[in-house]
């Protein structure tokens, strides 16, 4: 993904503060309730671009004259304790019901990002210093002239400098880094002085390779230098803003005024090459329009014609069938499908937008257009939240590199590739659960059978990475291909290195070959002789003709998307840490719903459930959920007690017979795939279909298992033989305490029988299978508890409050809330607890005496605490 390119050239408001003030004056009670609402949107992965867009809804009282409030509004306000408990809660991967929530919000704002893959022609607007060093002085030629937002016509030629300035500032937000930013760069690193957040998105799209990449793929193993150059990511600098007021002129509209997408009325002031690029944006016809509860006005839309091309209609059919974001069905008004207007109305705030004061009748249309303002504070906040959501699933939940052996190796401090994930990518992103068409497990024993024709494209599962920096770009660190700083070689950049710096063809994919053992990446950048040159002569501020030679003769449109992702989450922010954690006797309070979920996963799940293949019970107040593994308990916390983040894919191919299911993609990224594989080894049905287009071989149990007990290293043919060996040889009797000597374990148990049960975690021996879902378990007791999740049986009843539970231990802990019994005591301070997990967490507070009041993390060093407080302050930016 090279550079962020504006989908439109919209009218800009003075600032987000102005918009916020307008909304506050229009609805004074709306913003006093608290900052809460819903974010939902799409990620469209095309062959040559990724388009991310969506809506943000703030909770606000709905006028009785326009619509009636729904009972679900109370559930949104109480999202901290039970996210959308009024029938709208759902498991990840289940049907989303955001359509029921969108009706509750009259405040709707639009966000969008457009990222191109491997388009060198889009990188020439990236660097202001580079332009000025070439004596173009763009900053002096561009003038920010306020335009009348009510005027439907503007002088297109005179407005061109300002439009060009908008493109320039929009593109400046995304800069391709000249060198890879390491996940943990050392102090004084020339790459960046901060540690950027990493957003990693899975992708199975086919990205055409250049001839240089094809030749490189046929060559020998690349050098370390090639690997380092391969690490160029998209770097987003949040301190660069587009503050220019734009005229009421929209390039996108210039190419949507025809009855089809094949013919365009080009503006004479824009060259054909750039016109082709902008016209192709009309191929993305997903408006993601929320039908607000307004009175329909047919007169407002009587002059519009609706058009749909073949490609967009296919995408919309899938969208309407599997996505509920934009559909709203009521008794009085049928569901409105996606409509693509032949021409848009003037770029004014929609009648139901937060940027316009609502009237008593809220006259409007069913397809009120949202203001398309790119790269605002809210846009960057949304992208930052995606990174923060990704960080929720770091180790121990997201051992992303180890378990499926991506070829996305991390880089060490010296820039060389490492073979593990300790210094590499440390995040597991929930977006990875959304895209299909990838193997559930690597075939490490296969051979490389690629033909010459297959090397021109890469169909393998790979990742796109986005680096999120909270500062301005450090231009002193821009280094050209010869290793010379760009800040000190202005003349050389003007004549020679400018082509290298700007016209370089960047590649941000991480390719992985499924048919051969893990190896170093084979994709490199183009050589200098293959790069397209950019003219170095002076350009007039209103003339694009001199750029025509530098643009490709034909820019391919975004075609045949196979990865349309739907995502949503809810947010809630409180100033006084009013969101209480209701985990058993947890005294913590959080300022936002995101912080609450982060606290639950990091301070409770990671500490209470250190053995993810054992049954896990949720310890939230009045919650009796029993999970099968770490995946289930994490998803339960997300849906019922957290931000309710959900992500689904609306892929036409994914719903065809023989396509790879979402469960298979889950196996690719699951930190404990063994929990899903044992059932297959014991005869459970295989998810792989005989008609599978990818011809994935069935997952097989390892031929031999090795005993790792205190250096034993004996091999066995099955998990049962290993388990019998452990019980017969290594477990003695008659001890007062038993210790597990398995590699890196060393847990102690008061009874031998408990150690025997624990050993099955290491041996993977699970002889008990559920007849309903074919899952396997290590003990009969665990199987009985699991079957109650299917039957709904709760045989254990509290004799005081008559509450029922599925397992006896949950009832035992619950009764302590009535009796006040706290049998567990801290040996350091004497504080008592009613549950062992709370005691374990409390003991850690003695080991780390410095505690952050924002995120509840503890540290043993005061300097680390101060650094964490600064980080928390940056992450707690408001949406407005």
UniProtKB/Swiss-Prot annotation:
Protein name: Zinc-responsive transcriptional regulator ZAP1
Alphabetical UniProt keywords: DNA-binding, Metal-binding, Nucleus, Phosphoprotein, Repeat, Transcription, Transcription regulation, Zinc, Zinc-finger
Organismal lineage: Eukaryota, Fungi, Dikarya, Ascomycota, Saccharomycotina
Region (Disordered): 1-26, 140-164, 436-482, 510-555
Zinc finger regions, C2H2-type: 579-604, 616-641, 705-730, 738-762, 768-790, 796-818, 824-846
Function (record text): Transcription regulator controlling zinc-responsive gene expression. Binds to zinc-responsive elements (ZREs) (consensus sequence 5'-ACCYYNAAGGT-3') in the promoter of target genes. Recruits SWI/SNF, SAGA, and Mediator complexes as coactivators in a zinc-responsive manner. Involved in zinc ion homeostasis by zinc-responsive transcriptional regulation of the zinc uptake system genes ZTR1 and ZTR2. Positively regulates ETR1 expression, affecting mitochondrial function.
Residue spans of biased composition, Basic residues class: 460-474
Region named Zinc-responsive domain 2 (ZRD(AD2)): 579-641
Listed Low complexity bias regions: 17-26, 442-456, 545-555
Result, substituting residue 207 to A: Results in a significant defect in zinc responsiveness
Highest taxon above the source species: Eukaryota
Pfam families: Zap1_zf1, Zap1_zf2, zf-C2H2, zf-C2H2_6
Activity modulation notes: Active in zinc-limited cells and repressed in replete cells. Zinc controls ZAP1 DNA binding activity.
Matching Gene3D superfamilies: 6.10.140.370, Classic Zinc Finger
Record-listed Phosphoserine modification sites: 156, 166, 515
């Amino acid at each position: 993904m090279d550079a962020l390119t504006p989908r439109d050239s919209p009218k800009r408001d003075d600032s987000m503060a102005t918009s916020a003030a307008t909304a506050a004056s229009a609805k004074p009670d709306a913003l006093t309730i608290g900052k809460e609402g819903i974010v939902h949107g799409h990620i469209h992965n095309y062959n040559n671009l990724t388009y991310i867009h969506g809506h943000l809804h703030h909770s606000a009282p709905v006028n009785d004259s326009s619509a009636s409030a729904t009972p679900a509004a109370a559930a949104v306000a109480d999202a901290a304790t039970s996210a959308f408990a009024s029938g709208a809660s759902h498991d990840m991967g289940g049907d989303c019901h955001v359509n029921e929530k969108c009706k509750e919000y009259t405040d709707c704002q639009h966000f969008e990002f457009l990222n191109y893959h491997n388009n060198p022609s889009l990188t020439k607007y990236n660097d202001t210093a580079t332009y000025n060093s070439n004596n173009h002085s763009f900053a002096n030629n561009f003038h920010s002239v306020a335009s009348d937002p009510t005027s439907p016509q503007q002088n297109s030629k005179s407005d061109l400098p300002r439009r060009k300035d908008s493109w320039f500032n929009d593109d400046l937000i995304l800069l391709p880094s000249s060198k890879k930013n390491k996940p943990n760069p050392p102090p004084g690193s020339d790459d960046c002085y901060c540690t950027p957040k990493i957003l990693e998105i899975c992708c199975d799209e086919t990205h055409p390779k250049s001839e240089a990449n094809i030749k490189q793929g046929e060559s020998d193993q690349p050098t370390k230098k090639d690997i380092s150059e391969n690490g160029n990511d998209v770097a987003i600098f949040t301190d660069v803003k587009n503050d220019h007021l734009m005229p009421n002129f929209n390039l996108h509209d210039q190419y949507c005024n025809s009855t089809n997408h094949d013919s365009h009325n080009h503006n004479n002031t824009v060259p054909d090459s750039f016109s082709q690029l902008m016209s192709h944006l009309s191929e993305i016809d997903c408006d993601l329009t929320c039908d607000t509860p307004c009175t329909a006005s047919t007169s407002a839309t009587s002059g519009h014609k609706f058009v749909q091309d073949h490609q967009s209609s296919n995408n919309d059919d899938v969208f309407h069938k599997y996505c509920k974001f934009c559909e709203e069905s009521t008794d009085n008004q049928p569901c409105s499908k996606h409509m693509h207007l032949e021409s848009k109305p003037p770029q004014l705030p929609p009648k139901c937008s937060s940027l316009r004061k609502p009237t008593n009748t809220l006259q409007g249309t069913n397809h009120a257009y949202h203001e398309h303002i790119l790269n605002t504070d809210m846009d960057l906040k949304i992208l930052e939240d995606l990174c923060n959501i990704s960080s929720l699933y770091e180790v121990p939940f997201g051992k992303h590199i180890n378990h499926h052996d991506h070829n996305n190796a991390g880089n060490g401090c010296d820039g060389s590739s490492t073979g593990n994930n300790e210094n590499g990518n440390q995040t597991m992103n929930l977006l990875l659960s959304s895209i299909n068409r990838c193997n559930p497990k690597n075939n490490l024993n296969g051979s490389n059978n690629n033909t010459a024709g297959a090397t021109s494209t890469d169909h393998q599962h790979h990742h796109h990475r986005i680096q999120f920096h909270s500062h301005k770009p450090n231009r002193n660190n821009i280094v050209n291909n010869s290793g010379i700083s760009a800040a000190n070689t202005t003349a050389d950049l003007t004549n020679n290195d400018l082509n290298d710096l700007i016209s370089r063809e960047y590649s941000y994919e991480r390719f992985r070959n499924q048919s051969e053992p893990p190896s170093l990446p084979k994709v490199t950048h183009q050589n200098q002789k293959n790069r397209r040159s950019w003219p170095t002569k002076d350009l007039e501020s209103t003339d694009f003709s001199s750029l025509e030679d530098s643009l490709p003769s034909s820019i391919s449109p975004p075609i045949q998307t196979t990865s349309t992702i739907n995502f949503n989450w809810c947010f809630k922010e409180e100033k006084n840490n009013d969101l209480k954690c209701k985990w058993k006797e947890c005294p913590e309070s959080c300022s936002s719903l995101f912080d609450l979920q982060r606290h639950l996963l990091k301070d409770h799940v990671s500490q209470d459930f250190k053995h993810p293949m054992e049954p896990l019970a949720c310890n939230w107040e009045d919650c009796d959920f029993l999970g099968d593994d770490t995946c289930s308990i994490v998803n339960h916390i997300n849906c019922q007690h957290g931000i309710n983040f959900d992500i689904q894919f609306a892929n036409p191919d994914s719903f065809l017979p023989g396509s790879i299911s979402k469960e298979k993609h889950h196996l690719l990224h699951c930190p404990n795939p063994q929990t899903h594989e044992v059932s297959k080894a014991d005869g459970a049905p295989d998810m792989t279909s005989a008609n599978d287009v990818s011809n994935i071989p069935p997952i097989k149990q390892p031929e031999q298992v090795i005993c790792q007990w205190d250096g034993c290293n004996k091999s066995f043919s099955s998990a049962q033989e290993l388990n019998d060996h452990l019980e017969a040889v290594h477990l003695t009797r008659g001890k007062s305490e038993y210790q597990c000597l398995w590699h890196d374990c060393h847990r102690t148990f008061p009874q031998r029988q408990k150690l025997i049960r624990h050993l099955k975690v290491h041996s993977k021996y699970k002889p008990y299978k559920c007849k309903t879902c074919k899952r396997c378990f290590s003990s009969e007791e665990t199987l009985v508890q699991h079957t109650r999740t299917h039957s709904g049986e709760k045989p254990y009843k509290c004799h005081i409050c008559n509450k029922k539970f599925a397992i006896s231990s949950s009832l035992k802990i619950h009764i302590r809330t009535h009796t006040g019994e706290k049998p567990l005591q801290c040996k350091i301070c004497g504080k008592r607890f009613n549950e062992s997990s709370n005691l374990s967490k409390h003991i850690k507070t003695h080991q780390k005496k410095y505690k952050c009041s924002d995120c509840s993390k503890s540290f043993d060093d005061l300097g680390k605490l101060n650094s964490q407080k600064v980080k928390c302050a940056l992450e707690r930016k408001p949406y407005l």
